[in-house]
Each structure stands twice: as structure tokens, then as C-alpha cells.
Amino acid sequence: MLLSTLGSTLAVNGVSIAAASTPPLFQRESLPQEFSKVISLGKLRILVLSGSPHKDGTTNLLATNFVKGAKEAGHEVRRVNTSFEDINACRGCFFCLKNSGQCLIRDDVPAILHLIEQADVVIFVTPIYYYAIHSSLKALLERFTSRRTDFMKMPKKMGLIAVCGGKFEWSFDSINAHFDSLSRYLGWKDIGRSEARGYPTKTDIQKTEYPKLAYQFGFNLS
């Protein structure tokens, strides 16, 4: 089979067919401002890391409800939508381990890691893609390498909100094992997980208790 392209036309063995249009690149979002250095007694600095590439989907709905609940409880909340930031995968060069945590890669990750350092609580929000967290969140986690020693010394809390369109009972087994290991490795306290399976669309999940549960998760943090 011989393939060739000319403009928006794809030729297969000399026969011209219309080529599928390339989807537009995602619009990069600005990162949120840093957390306040001083915060009211009993209130928390909460960083929400949301991995969905769909701004009007199930994952975004639950993330938004969580943020609303946390803010209404008086907490200081920052949110990063990792699919819309410049996040590259770790190269495994270990330059950072020999150079005081500085990474060779120039992207948004150092600024995001700084927000994580400032936060008391880190909430990961993700769709399930092939029984794993979204690739943008995974890439960010890999880049923890440059701060892992510092993170291990910080008594943080972490939580998880995950959504899966499939209905298998074991849909969350792999990511639960991952987050068990992550919590254990970093020494961060696991404060809870909200996992919804069998809801592929926003309309589906709006009919359930999960949006309310996400709100309560944020509101009841302490």
C-alpha cells in the first residue's frame, strides 16, 4: 500500500480520498497563583490536580463540585488542569538528583511542583483510561523525582476522585494499587477516595449521588 498526502487530501494507491482534519491543539491554561503564606487557623491549602482533557465531562464536573465544597468550607483552593499545561515525561536522566532538584526540562512542571510544596492537601482527579490514570497526571507524577526527598519530609494529605465509563467491578484495582504505593512511598496520609464507575457521560453522572459526594468530600476536609 502506498500512501501520500497533498494538502487536505490523502492518496491511497493513487486513489484520492478526503483526509480527516487534525483536531486543534489544546489552549494552554495559565497556572494559578501561589498559595497565601498565612492562612486562617483550621483552614487548609488544597491543590486539585485534574487530568481530564474534557472541560465539560464527568471528571471536570466532580472536580468542580469538590472545589466548590472546599471553598465554601473556607479552605484556600488552587486547581491545575494537567491536560492543558505543558507537562513532559521524565527522561530518567537523574540530572535533578545531582543538581539540587533542578530539572533539565523547561516546562510548567517546576511551577506545579512548587504549588504542591505549598499545599497541605493534594487531590488527584482523573478519568480512567485503559485502567490507569490519565497520561498527563502520570507524566507529572514521574517528575516528582526532582522533589521526592523534599516531599517525603512534608506531612501532606492526599485524596483521589476517579471516574470510569466501564462497569467492571475491578475497574479501579490498578489505580488503587498505584495510589496505595504512592501514599506509602511519599508518607502522605490517604484521606479518602471517591470512585464512580459506569458513567461515560456528564448526563449519566448528573443523575447520581456522585456530584454531591464530591462536594461533600471538599466541604468536610479537615
Question: What feature does the model see in each segment?
Answer:
Residues 6-125, 131-147, 208-222:
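N-terminal beta1-alpha1-beta2 submodule of the flavodoxin-like/Rossmannoid cofactor-binding fold
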Residues 49-50, 125, 160-164, 194-195:
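Short beta-strands and strand-loop turn motifs
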Residues 86-89, 167-169, 201-202:
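A short beta-to-alpha transition loop/helix N-cap that caps and shapes the active-site region
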Residues 128-130, 165-166:
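Short glycine-rich anion-binding loops that position phosphate/pyrophosphate groups of nucleotides
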Residues 135-136, 149-192:
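Short, glycine-/small-residue-rich phosphate/pyrophosphate-handling segment
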Residues 163, 198-203:
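A short acidic, helix-capping loop that chelates divalent metal ions and anchors anionic groups
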Residues 170-173, 203-208:
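Short, solvent-exposed loop/turn segments at secondary-structure boundaries
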